[in-house]
Amino acid sequence: MPKVLIVDDDPDIVDSLKLILSAEGYAVAAATSREEGMRAVAKEKPDLIILDVMMEQPDDGLVVAQDLRHQGVKTPIIILSSIGHVTGYKFGKDSEVAPVDEFVSKPIAPKDLVAKVKKFLRK
């Protein structure tokens, strides 16, 4: 069963994403901070990571993505954030600022979330 790691400091978001993804048959782990997220990636070995951008610091999600890529982690990363594309940053595996595979704005419809997850996990 593919495992998804959610890193978001909003417990309501975490709970709703867990509910949606668990119902689709995914194993789901969660972390609520940048530090917890980094530890969870090492411990849980997820097949997909969903990150919020703004947690304790305004750029926490981007820092997690940057740190993971610098460590050689190839796991697909989806940024799920209320700031959308307003930052003007280019995202993608080759981006230094936002080395993620997908950037999705909150709120997201459950069916759209599942479609994004399936895109990367081919389930």
What are these regions (language model features)?
Residues 44-50:
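Active-site beta3 strand of CheY-like receiver
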Residues 80-82:
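Hydrophobic/aromatic residues positioned on beta-strands within the core alpha/beta folds
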Residues 10, 54-56:
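The short loop immediately C-terminal to the conserved phospho-acceptor aspartate in CheY-like receiver
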Residues 11-29:
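Two-component/phosphorelay signaling modules centered on CheY-like receiver
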Residues 42-44, 68-74:
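Conserved phosphotransfer cores of two-component systems
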Residues 7-8, 31, 49:
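Conserved sequence signature across two-component system core domains
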Residues 62-63, 70, 84-104, 111, ...:
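Alpha4 helix (beta4-alpha4-beta5 surface) of REC/receiver domains from two-component response regulators
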Residues 30-39, 60-61:
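Helix N-cap/capping motif at the beta->alpha junctions
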